Design a protein with these regions (language model features):
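Short membrane-interfacial helix/loop motifs at transmembrane-helix boundaries
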Residues: 4, 33-70, 132, 136-137, ...
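Membrane-interfacial helix termini and adjacent extracytoplasmic/periplasmic loops
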Residues: 7-11, 126-167, 201, 237-241
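Transmembrane alpha-helices
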Residues: 24-27, 32-33, 116, 168-187, ...
C-alpha cells in the first residue's frame, strides 16, 4: 500500500507567494482608491452644512439637483473634452506616423521634443498660453491679418482658448500611444498592400489605420478622461460663461463648502465618463489598448 501524498494547502510550500505578491497592490488600491470613492459616495448622500455638520440621510436629491442645476456645465465638459480629443488625434496622428516611419535615427530626439515641455507643471504651461493668446500677442495679430478675427477681437477668454489649452496640455497622452501602436506595425503589410496595387491612401485606410486602432483608442481615452474633469484651463484662459463641471466642483468643495453637492457632481461625472468610455470601446471594437 503506497503512502498517501501530503495534501497541499493554501499556505503550504510556495502556493502562498502569488497572494503575498498581490497583497501590497490590493492594500494600495483599497487605501487610496476604494476608500476615497466610498467616502465620496457617502458624502454625496449627506445633508447639512459646515457649521451644523453633515449627516448621512441617503439624500438622493443631491444627484437630481446637481444634474438639473448644472446641465450646461455637464454638456460643456463633454463638448470641450470631445473637441480637444478630436483635435489632439488630428494633430498627433501625423506626428506619430512621421516619428514611427520617417524619423529614422532621430526618433528618440523627436520623442524627447514631444514630452520635454511637459517636464514643467500643468499650471505653468497653461499660463504660457495666456501670454501667447494675449490681445497684444502675435497669434491675435496673425488671425487679424488673415481676416479670421475682426479688429479689436480677441482669442483669450473664449471657448477657442479653453479648447486650445486643453488640447495642448494633453498632446503627449495622444502622441505616445499612437507612436507605440504604429511602431509595432509590420511594415511588410503596407508593402504587401502596395504589391496588390493599393495606393498610399487606400493602404492607409485599409491597413495602417485599422491596425493602429488600439493606439487610437488608448490615446482618446487617456485624453478625454482627464480633459472632461479639467478646470485649470477655464480658470486662466476662459471666463465663468465657459465654466466646466470641474470648475463647479472646485468651487463647491473649496469656496462654498457644499460637500454633498460637490461629491454628487463628482460621482455623476465619473459615472458619465465611465458610460461614455464603455460605449466608445464597444463601438471601436477593440479591447487591446496597446
Amino acid at each position: 500500500m503506497s503512502p498517501v501524498p501530503p495534501r497541499r494547502g493554501l499556505l503550504s510550500g510556495t502556493a502562498w507567494m502569488p497572494y503575498a505578491l498581490l497583497l501590497p497592490g490590493l492594500l494600495w488600491l483599497g487605501l487610496f482608491f476604494v476608500t476615497p470613492i466610498l467616502t465620496l459616495l457617502s458624502t454625496s448622500l449627506q445633508e447639512g452644512s459646515i457649521s451644523t455638520g453633515y449627516r448621512l440621510t441617503w439624500r438622493f436629491a443631491n444627484y437630481t439637483n446637481a444634474f438639473w442645476d448644472y446641465q450646461a456645465q455637464f454638456g460643456r465638459s463633454i463638448l470641450y473634452a470631445s473637441l480637444a480629443t478630436l483635435l489632439a488625434l488630428v494633430i498627433c496622428y501625423p506626428l506619430a506616423y512621421f516619428i514611427a516611419f520617417r524619423a529614422g535615427r532621430y526618433k528618440n530626439l523627436m520623442l524627447l521634443i514631444v514630452v520635454a515641455p511637459f517636464f514643467t507643471s500643468f499650471l505653468i504651461r497653461t499660463l504660457s498660453w495666456k501670454i501667447i493668446l494675449a490681445d497684444s500677442g502675435w497669434v491675435v495679430g496673425v488671425f487679424q491679418t488673415l481676416g479670421l478675427l475682426p479688429p479689436g477681437g480677441r482669442l483669450l477668454a473664449t471657448s477657442f482658448a479653453v479648447v486650445a489649452g486643453i488640447t495642448y496640455n494633453f498632446l503627449p497622452f495622444m502622441t505616445l500611444p499612437l507612436y507605440t501602436s504604429l511602431e509595432r506595425l509590420d511594415a511588410s503589410l503596407i508593402e504587401a498592400a502596395g504589391d496588390l496595387y493599393a495606393g498610399p491612401v487606400t493602404a492607409f485606410f485599409k491597413v495602417t489605420f485599422p491596425l493602429s486602432m488600439p493606439g487610437v483608442v488608448a490615446g482618446t481615452l487617456l485624453t478625454f478622461i482627464p480633459a472632461a474633469g479639467d478646470y485649470i484651463n477655464v480658470r486662466f484662459l476662459g471666463t465663468p460663461s465657459q465654466s466646466m463641471l470641474g470648475n463647479v466642483i472646485d468651487s463647491r468643495f473649496l469656496a462654498v463648502l457644499d460637500y454633498p453637492t460637490a461629491a454628487a457632481l463628482s460621482i455623476t461625472l465619473m459615472f458619465t465618463i465611465l458610460v461614455l468610455v464603455g460605449l466608445y470601446v464597444r463601438r471601436a471594437g477593440t479591447e487591446d489598448l496597446v
